[in-house]
Amino acid sequence: MKHTGFPAALIGLMIAACSPASEDSTGAPAPSADATDTSHTESMTSVAINEADLRHRISTLADDGFEGRSPATPGGIAASQWIADEMARIGLAPGYGDSYFQPVSLLAVTLEADQSSFDVAFEGEPLGLSMGEDVVYWSKLNSSEISVTDSELVFVGYGVVAPEYGWDDYAGLDVEGRTVVMLVNDPGYANPDSGLFNGNAMTYYGRWTYKYEEAARQGAAGVILIHQTAPASYGWNVVSGSWSGTQLDLAREPGQGTFSDIESWVTEDRARQMFDLAGLDFDAVTAAAARPGFEAVPMTGLTASGTLVNSTDTMESRNVVGIVPGTTRPDEYVLYTAHWDHLGSREVAEGEDGIYNGAVDNATGTAAILEIGEAFVGEPAERSVMILAVTAEESGLLGSAYYGENPIVPYEQTAGGINIDAILPSGRSRDVVVVGHGASELEDILTEAATEQDRYIVADPTPEAGYFYRSDHISLAKHGVPMLYADGGFDLREGGSEAGMAAGEDYRANRYHGPADEYSADWDMSGMVEDTTLFFTVGSRLANSDAWPNWYEGNEFRALRDAQMGTE
């Protein structure tokens, strides 16, 4: 998920003779000559970062021939094959043994809504929660039928266990077989000036993904997450739209992964009703949940029951991995990530456009990491550089999550990484926005490189929305690897902040996650070239140094990195 509410742009020498990456013959579609930038051919790309190369790669990836690059579809297979072929052509070594492909198995789970039910009852009387209107529920278990019966409800505040903040909402609590009810975001959001957590800036503990993970670790049978628009940073329409229909997850062997039986969201209105029935003052109890010393509260008389009938299917996709070997320390790595997938295509009326090309999101990022990879081939660094184009970001960061669980390079040999996700073609900016500002020492390298471009660093303007936790770098951060997530800013050199904000809003309102997100020859590529150069410079300095950046003191991932590197 991109931070499209942001203004403007927020939102090998040793393998010269390697063979092409054409490892399969799928009969999948190929880019159409009339839609790609045919003024610039693949054989003309240069090790110098430049506009023509970026245009060629973006226009190719965003072409109708790839049908929106949805994973495990003919278009997605063809797009990932093109990326692998491009890596081979420009001189990157295969990153997964002798292959450019790291296989990623995906599990598609479709809730059979007409055969499924989930409700909360008070003293045996169902509340009558309506799917989509009041509640959205699902299960990630690879099972055709999942049942929970008369599971007692308990309010666990924010559902957080954060030792570095001295916080444990599950302290002394046994939730085995029970259904936990919790708030979105973290205590710092409710008390931005209290010094709790990271104040108004969301931490990983505020993300819904963490909350479901922690509840499962605690043994909860069910999870009910209370939706509130401000702390979630999106309305109920996003919840009801995003968690209905087929859901994708990583396909795991039996016993792998930990999930509660049923996960759900409920509207605030219905949550207030539940609290009232349990004799609890919603405002008072939720306020107490944001203060140190909070203890979980049983929701007396309330139980949850449900039977979910699922149909499941396993699909195969792949991450695409290329490496530029290091000249003196090839076992140490700097990582670049971008997701290659988008939303595919939809059936529409004749004459309408049903292909979601994803030109900005994220043909731009994929093109940028290929451009950076080619630049490193021309200028190899002391450390190796890995170019990782991941699948299924739009389905929940699944490709990067798979890499996170199955790293090709040990984390203690990965010095750090840079994620590129959606670069708006709105021109050069005076600023660079760091999403999740104040996270890691990679920002020190970025600040120096940006200053040399006569640019300044600004913090993410809406830290409470937790955008740092919504793109692929988080899958590496969760395993301790310092990751940088930055974008060109909104203070444009032509038009200033007003023009930058207008460009960002125009994209968010008219093209983001829609069929209108298409490449245009009219794009102003100057900012994209500058940003890509900046990200190359940051990675090059790290790859040519002996530095091992860490997360800043107090960051939720610092302890992981310290343990990894033996610096506890």
Predicted regions and their residues:
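C-terminal motif of bacterial Sec signal peptides marking the signal peptidase cleavage site
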Residues: 15-17
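Bacterial signal peptide processing site
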Residues: 19-22
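Noncatalytic luminal/extracellular "stalk/propeptide" segments of secretory-pathway proteins
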Residues: 44, 67-193, 298-300, 312, ...
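Soluble metallo-hydrolase cores and metallopeptidase-like ectodomains found primarily
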Residues: 113, 121-123, 135-172, 254-358, ...
